[in-house]
């Protein structure tokens, strides 16, 4: 599929597309499982944490704050309604480490953005906690390549239609690049846009979804390969 010159804007996902994210949450999850090892099996801790995350996302949205609340809720239930002091401080340490980890840019991202800059208007289209996502965007060193950063409440068809309207685009004029089939690929092609999938080896369970069949989806093995379609 030749996309050269067919789009004015390119929208990029952020977490696990531009920089590493999920691997840090997996590391936090492993520490949490160890912390609660005396209360149930590793599978029991993991299942409880996942269920509490799913319960809290509709209330608090996406991001490490929701993850922190989910950990506290899971620990409280697993501990029988009373949170021991060492569990409380253990959770606090896990969340602190998660919140202040070094931001690691994914290999090939900077070179790809440098090549595209000047040919397209590049926009980050991510979801999550606004201050958290904007903070990562600012310290990433990538802001110089982007027109601006959109932090969306969610990433479904409705949100992408709103994004298109905001930029005076028809839905079929959206070109989205991202790692998540559920958030970056399926909703975009469902409204008529084009999506380029840059798979990541670590996928959040909440984002797992089979790839839809569509001739408007391109799958690349690393982000540098998008240049073959765009320049």
Placement of each model-derived feature along the sequence:
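A metal-dependent, Asp-based hydrolase signature
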Residues: 47, 52-97
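Short helix-capping segments at alpha-helix termini
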Residues: 38-42, 80-82, 141-144, 168
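Substrate-recognition element of Asp-dependent hydrolases with the DxDx(T/V) motif
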Residues: 86-104, 109-140, 149-152
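Asp-based, Mg2+/Mn2+-dependent phosphohydrolase catalytic module
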Residues: 1-7, 110, 114, 129-130, ...
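Active-site neighborhood of HAD-like aspartate-dependent phosphohydrolases
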Residues: 1-48
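An amphipathic alpha-helix signature
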Residues: 25-33, 68, 72, 130
């Amino acid at each position: 599929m030749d996309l050269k010159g067919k789009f004015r804007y390119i929208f990029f996902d952020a977490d696990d597309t531009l920089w590493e994210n999920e691997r840090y949450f997996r590391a936090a999850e492993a520490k949490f499982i160890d912390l609660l090892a005396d209360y149930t099996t590793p599978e029991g801790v993991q299942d409880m944490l996942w269920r509490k995350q799913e319960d809290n996302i509709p209330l608090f949205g996406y991001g490490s704050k929701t993850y922190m609340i989910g950990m506290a809720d899971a620990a409280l239930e697993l501990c029988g309604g009373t949170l021991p002091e060492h569990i409380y401080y253990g959770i606090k340490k896990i969340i602190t480490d998660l919140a202040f980890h070094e931001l690691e840019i994914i290999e090939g991202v900077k070179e790809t953005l440098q090549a595209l800059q000047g040919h397209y208007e590049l926009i980050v289209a991510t979801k999550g906690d606004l201050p958290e996502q904007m903070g990562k965007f600012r310290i990433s060193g990538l802001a110089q390549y982007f027109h601006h950063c959109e932090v969306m409440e969610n990433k479904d068809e409705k949100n992408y239609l709103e994004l298109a309207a905001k930029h005076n685009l028809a839905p079929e004029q959206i070109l989205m690049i991202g790692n998540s089939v559920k958030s970056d690929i399926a909703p975009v092609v469902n409204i008529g846009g084009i999506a380029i999938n840059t798979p990541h080896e670590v996928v959040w369970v909440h984002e797992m979804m089979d790839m839809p069949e569509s001739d408007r989806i391109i799958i690349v093995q690393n982000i540098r390969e998008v240049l073959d379609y765009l320049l």
